[in-house]
Swiss-Prot record:
Keywords associated with the record: mRNA processing, mRNA splicing, Nucleus
Compartments where located: Nucleus
Cellular component per GO, a single term: nucleus
Family annotation (SUPFAM superfamilies): Surp module (SWAP domain)
Keyword Membrane: no
Name of the protein in question: SURP and G-patch domain-containing protein 1-like protein
Compositionally biased residues, Basic and acidic residues: 285-300
Disordered, as annotated region: 45-71, 83-141, 198-221, 241-272, 285-325
Major localisation: nucleus
Species for this entry: Arabidopsis thaliana
Alphabetical GO biological process terms: mRNA processing; RNA splicing
UniProt repeat feature SURP motif, residue ranges: 142-185
Length: 443
């Protein structure tokens, strides 16, 4: 190496590594001096440390660790390529300034937390603002009407409307609770419920001032006509314009009693879903009105002969076979029931006997009248004979022996099972014989 050359000029004489090691040792000595000066600085002790100071000391620990780590890095001469970051020396005034800044930052954190606590209240106030109405006027009208109906009659009406109107209908916003139209509907529903609760409260206060009698008479919310008649509101009422209550009740009764031309089994074709819903609601109400009341399981149904001709099983094309009691003629059935302690049948039998009584046009009645007999007197010269005529039905025509009784003859002391058995025997006796086959009388 040429000693006359300046040290900054690189000389390619093979002593490059030795030169580089000397430079690194000089840099390490300079940095060790800087660290010793910083460690020899007097430490400031505070008698009553503030909570902010504690937090500051905790926040400064990583810097101390970095300094110690830097010191260790300087002492390791093998890692010569790792250069520590430059150390900035600060005075005690700088440390005080940092304390003030940390205290200000701690206060700003508190303010941010308070602002975060206040934001839910502000957001709740903002939620009271009405959402924008739907752009489609039909959807807006449907949402308003549906909100009023649901507020009056409960959430089940909304579920029924959702089930009855699937697909692309004006009610499609019910299937997406996050859309703007559904939020508008929920807002309108809350307004309607609030209005109804206010009217109820005002009605209760008014009735309390008027007295107990007027409170029972004055009802804040009267039931609509469709609830009194058991008729459900059709969904097409959501489209109709409000009319007078009297006219609406009359039109509802007329629509129930008088079916329209569009009432067919296929329903109105090419109509909107609301008209279809109204049609099916009206049809269900008519079927419910025409449905017969259910009979108790313990009660024995009346025979088909006592029912209407359209209700008999023989005229029903959907049923096969017959009940044995259907073949009993009405006259025979009346006689049978009159012997079963049936009050209605006994009364009917007495009325029939009065109508079938022998009148003055009878030949025997005329003959006895010529002989001086009067109605109510006995036969004979002493007027003490038989007064009542002999009934032809009591004559024995079944060739029974002496002391024998007919097994199918009903008695008042028979129970319901014995009466039913004998009634079936009577029906078998009068069973039809369309082919005219000879039959033996079993009873």
């Amino acid at each position: 190496m040429d000693k006359g050359a300046p040290p900054s000029i690189f000389v390619n004489d093979g002593s490059f590594m030795e030169r580089f090691r000397q430079l690194q040792q000089e840099k390490d000595k300079d940095k060790d001096k800087v660290v010793q000066v910083e460690d020899s600085k007097p430490v400031k002790i505070i008698s009553n440390p503030k909570p902010a100071a504690n937090k500051i000391s905790i926040g400064l620990k990583p810097n101390d660790a970095q300094k110690k780590g830097g010191k260790l890095a300087f002492s390791l001469k093998q890692k010569s390529k790792l250069l520590a970051p430059p150390v900035k020396l600060g005075t005690e005034e700088d440390e005080d300034d940092e304390d003030v800044k940390h205290e200000q930052g701690f206060g700003s954190v508190k303010r941010q937390k308070l602002e975060q606590r206040d934001t839910p209240v502000k957001s709740a106030k903002v939620s009271d603002v009405a959402p924008p109405p739907p752009s489609d006027p039909t959807v807006k009208k449907v949402a308003d009407k549906l909100a009023s109906f649901v507020a009056k009659h409960g959430r089940p009406f909304e579920h029924i409307t959702r089930q009855k109107n699937p697909g692309d209908t004006p009610f499609k916003f019910l299937f997406d609770e996050n859309c703007a139209d559904y939020k508008y509907y929920v807002f309108r529903l809350a307004e309607e419920e609030k209005l109804i609760s206010q009217t109820k409260d005002s009605g209760v206060l008014h009735s309390g001032d008027a007295g107990s009698r007027t409170s029972t008479a004055a009802i804040p919310l009267q039931k609509p006509a469709y609830q009194q008649t058991g008729y459900q509101i059709p969904a097409s009422a959501l489209y109709d314009t409000p009319v007078e209550p009297g006219a609406s009740s009359r039109s509802a009764q007329a629509s129930i009693t008088r079916p329209s031309d569009s009432d067919s089994f296929s329903g109105p074709r090419g109509a909107d879903p609301l008209s279809m819903m109204e049609f099916y609601m009206k049809k269900a109400a008519q079927e419910e009105k025409m449905r017969r009341p259910r009979q108790s399981k313990d009660e024995m149904p009346p025979p088909a002969s006592l029912q209407g001709p359209s209700e008999t099983s023989s005229t029903d094309p959907g049923k096969r076979g017959h009940h044995m009691g259907d073949y009993i003629p009405l006259e025979e059935l009346d006689k049978f029931l009159s012997k079963c302690n049936d009050a209605a049948a006994q009364k009917a039998t007495k009325e029939a006997a009065e109508k079938a009584k022998i009148q003055a046009d009878n030949v025997g009645h005329k003959l006895l009248s010529k002989m001086g007999w009067k109605e109510g007197e006995g036969i004979g010269s002493s007027r003490k004979g038989m007064a009542d005529p002999i009934m032809a039905g009591d004559v024995k025509t079944n060739n029974l022996g002496v002391g024998a009784s007919a097994p199918g003859e009903v008695k008042p002391e028979d129970d319901i099972y014995e009466q039913y058995k004998k009634r079936m025997m009577l029906g078998y006796k009068h069973r039809p014989n369309p082919l005219g086959n000879p039959r033996k009388a079993y009873y």
